[in-house]
Swiss-Prot record:
SMART domains per the UniProt record, alphabetical: AAA (SM00382), ClpB_D2-small (SM01086)
Record-given protein name: Heat shock protein 100
Region feature (I): 159-407
Region feature II, mapped onto this chain: 529-720
Region annotated Repeat 2, chain positions: 83-144
InterPro entries xref list: AAA+_ATPase, ATPase_AAA_core, Clp_ATPase_C, Clp_N_dom_sf, Clp_R_dom, ClpA/B, ClpA/B_CS1, ClpA/B_CS2
Positions of the Clp R domain: 4-144
Keywords linked to the UniProt accession: ATP-binding, Chaperone, Nucleotide-binding, Repeat
GO BP terms, alphabetized: cellular response to heat
Gene: HSP100
Record: residues binding ATP: 204-211, 603-610
Nucleotide-binding among keywords: yes
Cystine connections: none
Region described as Repeat 1: spans on this chain: 8-75
């Protein structure tokens, strides 16, 4: 009969219950020792499996499963299952527990009890796990501890189970090299060498290399490059997730942590614990009045019995650690700052070999330098060196993916060959003379494609063979790790063979392969990671076009002012200034810590201020909606300032971010339009000062948003009454311009005006400008009609008629749009509904001589260009 819960540990009780379930599953009427053994050894993390691994024993699962399968079945399945005479081995288990002085029956007692069954004992002996060997392994695992807790089995070798030996990883060469950070490493070692309070805590922003410092200390311990007090110590990284996982019962988490701490305390050589994200121990495991992890650590930390390296971010240190003064006092802070671009380049150069070996590609030094520079300039919401390393890693992954796919030239030819072969098969079935002639031509085409394809495939295979061999040789450079291990272990013969024979041969072969690849001028396979690959990754992440300009982009930028002129009529000065600013930015010559450009557009309503901003967005992003538009008439109250940067803490909407900061934070390359800026409350302008000067703004959550890649435009109607003079000349325009600027200076404060790159005054639209506006408006109507298959054509006299009846000098171009919508677009809509417009037809709008009303004529099958 199985023991009650109070007589067994949780693991033992679970094993006995699972053995009963195993017997029921196999339709056995009783529980055999083989059922219990199978359950124990199936649990890979259980004590029984750990004993077998410690003994390097063979597998026992298959013979045990065969033994269970050979047991007699009972049909129908029995309702109750009992233990066989030796299935529970209950008397022996109780006797074994009493013999060693244990309060509860544990899994190790079950394991020893299995040897009372002759069949199970034979299986264990065949796997080289005799009873004596198992008892010895259990004694070594228990280390003299008595079974007094229901969770006892989980506490055997707790340090190995709930922590990772960083020194072991360093010995095996599995840790990345730590470049630089000498001051922080030495400061940490000095704190560890103290008598009391020898617990450093690494504090820094996420991604600056806190964990790398702990790994660097592990590598120094392995090399012996540490003070005598740290020689032969081991550095373990505590896995809090493994400690907490599965600890559903009260007290289970505390038992696990106490067993880890006791092993650390009792270790002969000394153990240093590294706890990443140490703020998590504050409150970890706390529930229903039980202690949290921090309170278990505090006494040992204070007495110097436990040496711990913690790591956390500045924000989490302030939020969690500083609130627990007793916990904070037991640690000495070591601040880890973000490395400079030069230091980051050194770090990347040190890691380059690892990434080359992993991805099987070559990384140029230019790519390393550009990765650090672009990461520093454009990826502003993360920290070095983490963001630069990620850039290199993703660029390598992209090149590796391209290496794994066939070149486009070969792919096109192979598809063409398959199509021709399918056509040839179809033609072979056709007996007509024309088909036979066509078949000859198709076979000739297949022959020609094969002749073109064969050398390409041969060249591709040769290049892939070299690259695959290069990757294999780079991975074999792990022999350097064996060299370091041989030197540490004093195996000088092996070290000499590796240093003067094996490693030089590998390096010579790598050098030879790289030279062969370099000599090939036109390659089908690109295995190098260049600065262009890194820039492409930055462009994908941020939307900022930092990749090298293609010929199309060059022509587009050089002709930018011409494209803008087509859309914005009569504002030559404004267009030229905006185009010049964009060219400076795309050439990489804009100031690094300020917006790409900042303008104040002044002028009367309807002259093209907002239209020019839309045109810039359309030219840069192919979509005029791709801009952040802030209508300043919505910010007339003083309290509305918070909407730009986000509501303060404690207010509704704090987590949603600001209407200005959030779009720019997510899409840092954008056009930001502050429309009708004079209508906002004066306090709103204070928010803009830092944006215009330093290209940065801190939102309500303390995050710095980078505006250095934005074009900022403010529009205003201030002083527009001075520009409505119909008799304007170039000389009078300068006077009028000064009057407008005087009005602006009297309204806006000097600190705002002084931060703008340029103040552009838009001219009043002249008659010839308005003709171009009419053309643009009709082009917009034709764009809307394109999907219906219609187009509109205006006679010359119609434009004058529209200007005469639709133009208002004080209102600019907007009245023209309203007039065209009312008198032309409405008539087109009426004709469409009445089905008076056949498909693919042109609607000609004309004005009869002496007439006062437009007429509409329809021509089918002609475009507006073909209609004379």
């Amino acid at each position: 009969m199985a023991h009650s819960d109070r007589q067994c540990t949780n693991a033992a009780q679970t094993a006995l219950s699972d053995a009963v379930e195993s017997a029921r599953k196999h339709n056995n009427g009783f529980v055999d020792p083989a059922h219990l053994a199978l359950v124990l050894f199936k649990n890979e993390d259980g004590l029984a499996s750990r004993v077998l691994r410690k003994l390097n024993a063979g597998t026992v699962l298959e013979p045990l499963a065969a033994r269970v399968g050979a047991l007699p079945e009972q049909r129908p399945r029995p309702r109750s299952i009992t233990f066989s005479s030796d299935g529970g081995c209950a008397q022996h288990r109780r006797a074994e527990a009493n013999r060693v002085g244990d309060s509860l029956i544990a899994v190790d007692h079950l394991l020893i009890g299995l040897f009372e069954c002759k069949e199970v004992e034979a299986i264990m002996k065949a796997a080289h796990a005799s009873k004596k060997a198992v008892e010895g392994a259990l004694l070594e695992l228990r280390k003299g501890k008595k079974v007094t807790s229901e969770f006892q089995e989980e506490n055997y070798q707790a340090l190995e189970k709930y922590a990772t030996d960083l020194c072991k990883l360093a010995e095996e060469g599995k840790l990345d090299p730590v470049i630089g950070r000498t001051d922080e490493v030495l400061r940490t070692i000095r704190v560890l060498s103290r008598r009391t309070k020898n617990n450093p805590i690494l504090i820094g922003e996420p991604g600056v290399g806190k964990t790398a410092i702990a790994e660097g200390i592990a590598q120094r311990i392995v090399r012996g490059d540490v003070p005598d007090t740290l020689l032969n110590t081991r550095l373990f990284s505590l896995d809090l997730g493994a400690l907490i996982a599965g600890s559903s019962l009260r007290g289970e988490f505390e038992e696990r942590l106490k067993s880890v701490l006791n092993e650390v305390k009792e270790s002969s050589n000394g153990v240093i614990l590294f706890i990443d994200e140490i703020h998590l121990v504050l409150g970890a495991g706390k529930s229903g009045g039980s202690m949290d992890a921090a309170n278990l650590l505090k006494p040992m930390l204070a007495r110097g019995e436990l040496r711990t390296i913690g790591a956390t971010t500045l924000e989490e240190y302030r939020t969690y650690v500083e609130k627990d003064a007793a916990f904070e006092r037991r640690f000495m802070p070591v601040y880890v700052t973000e490395p400079s671009v030069e230091e980051c380049i050194s770090i990347l150069r040190g890691l380059k070999d690892r990434y080359e070996a992993h991805h099987g590609v070559q990384i140029t030094d230019n790519a390393v330098v550009v990765a650090a520079q672009l990461a520093n300039r454009y990826i502003t919401n993360r920290f070095m060196p983490d963001k630069a390393i990620d850039l290199i890693d993703e660029a390598c992954a992209n090149v590796r993916v391209q290496l794994s796919s066939r070149p486009e030239a070969i792919d096109i030819l192979e598809r063409k060959k398959r199509q021709l072969e399918i056509e040839a098969k179809a033609l072979e079935r056709d007996k007509e003379a024309a088909s036979r002639e066509r078949l000859k031509l198709v076979k000739a085409d297949i022959q020609r494609v094969e002749e073109e394809l064969q050398p390409l495939v041969s060249k591709y295979n040769d290049e892939r063979q070299r690259i695959d061999e290069l990757q294999e040789m780079q991975s074999r450079l792990d022999e350097k790790k064996k060299l370091e291990r041989a030197v540490r272990d004093g195996k000088m013969d092996l070290a000499a063979d590796l240093q003067y024979n094996v490693i030089p041969l590998i390096q010579d072969r790598i050098r030879s392969l790289k030279e062969d690849i370099e000599r090939q001028k036109a390659t089908l396979v690109q295995e190098k990671v260049t600065e262009g690959d890194v820039a492409a990754v930055v462009a994908r992440w941020t939307g900022i076009p930092v990749v090298k300009l293609s010929q199309t982009d060059r022509e587009r930028l050089l002709n930018l002012s011409m494209h803008l002129h087509r859309r914005v009529k009569g504002q030559d000065e404004a267009v030229e200034r905006v185009a010049d600013a964009i060219i400076r930015a795309r050439a990489g010559l804009s100031r690094p810590n300020s917006p790409t450009a900042s303008f104040l557009f002044l002028g009367p309503t309807g002259v093209g201020k907002t239209e020019l901003v839309k045109a810039v967005a359309a030219e840069l992003f192919d979509d005029e909606k791709h801009m952040v538009r802030i209508d300043m008439s919505e910010y007339m109250e003083q309290h509305s300032v918070s909407r730009l940067i986000g509501a303060p803490p404690g207010y509704i909407g704090h987590d949603e971010g600001g209407q200005l900061t959030e779009p720019v934070r997510r899409r840092p390359h954008a056009v930001v339009l502050f429309d009708e800026v004079e209508k906002a409350h004066p306090n709103v302008y204070n928010v803009l000062l830092q944006v215009l000067d330093d290209g940065r703004l801190t939102d309500s959550r303390g995050r710095t948003v980078d505006f250095s890649n934005t074009i900022i435009v403010m529009t205003s109607n201030l002083g527009s009454e001075h520009l409505l003079n119909p008799e304007e000349t170039n000389e009078s325009y300068e006077v009028l311009r000064e009057n407008v600027l005087a009005a602006v200076r009297s309204y806006f404060r000097p600190e705002l005006i002084n931060r703008l790159d340029d103040i552009v005054v838009f001219r009043r639209l002249r008659t010839e400008d308005l003709r171009g506006v009419v053309d643009n408006l009709i082009a917009g109507v034709n764009e809307r009609l394109k999907s219906s298959g219609f187009s509109v054509l205006l006679d010359d006299g119609v434009k004058d008629f529209i200007l005469e009846h639709g133009h208002d000098a004080n209102m600019g171009a907007r009245p023209l749009r309203r007039w065209i919508e009312k008198n032309i677009v409405t008539e087109i809509g009426r004709m469409l509904i009445a089905k008076e417009l056949p498909p693919n037809s042109t609607l000609r709008v004309s004005l009869p001589e002496g007439g006062n009303k437009l007429t509409f004529g329809v021509k089918r099958g002609l475009t507006s260009d073909e209609w004379e």
